[in-house]
From Swiss-Prot:
Residue ranges with Basic residues bias: 1-26
Subcellular location(s) of the protein: Cytoplasm
Organism listed in the record: Macaca fascicularis
Protein name per the record: Large ribosomal subunit protein eL29
Alphabetized UniProt keyword annotations: Acetylation, Cytoplasm, Methylation, Phosphoprotein, Repeat, Ribonucleoprotein, Ribosomal protein
Length: 157
């Protein structure tokens, strides 16, 4: 038969939480550092025996709250309040992923291409612009060769 352990962990957390896990005494009244400890101790007893001294507890609480408010006011410096601008969710990445998708993005890509085609200047307008540019250019400058043709004259060294 297996030997039982001396220390058990069974039911421990329930035991700890039954009375509430308490902070160390030094950290208990962090915001009430300016208040004397005797007063705080009395306040705790008044809380425990609230049937005996309900009025006392209420006065103590009021005193403690005012003392706490003063302590907090002394500790915290007022900050400038900045207006909060609501930030919307960025859907940029979702949109890009949708466009890049092989099936889903087919129509989206078609629409984008159509929009780009519509934005491009028309062929007639291009021809008019080119004729105006050629007429305005002086005759000394030779006309540009077509894209595929090579230049016949080379600079001699």
């Amino acid at each position: 038969m297996a030997k039982s352990k001396n220390h058990t962990t069974h039911n421990q957390s329930r035991k700890w939480h039954r009375n509430g896990i308490k902070k160390p005494r030094s950290q208990r009244y962090e915001s009430l550092k300016g208040v004397d400890p005797k007063f705080l101790r009395n306040m705790r007893f008044a809380k425990k025996h609230n049937k005996k001294g309900l009025r006392k507890m209420q006065t103590n609480n009021a005193k403690a709250m005012s003392a706490r408010a003063e302590a907090v006011k002394a500790l915290v410096k007022p900050k400038e309040v900045k207006p909060k601008i609501p930030k919307g969710v960025s859907r940029k990445l979702d949109r890009l992923a949708y466009i890049a998708h092989p099936k889903l993005g087919k129509r989206a890509r078609a629409r984008i291409a159509k929009g780009l085609r519509l934005c491009r200047p028309k062929a007639k307008a291009k021809a008019k612009d080119q004729t105006k540019a050629q007429a305005a250019a002086p005759a000394s400058i030779p006309a540009q060769a077509p894209k595929g043709a090579q230049a016949t004259t080379k600079a001699t060294e």
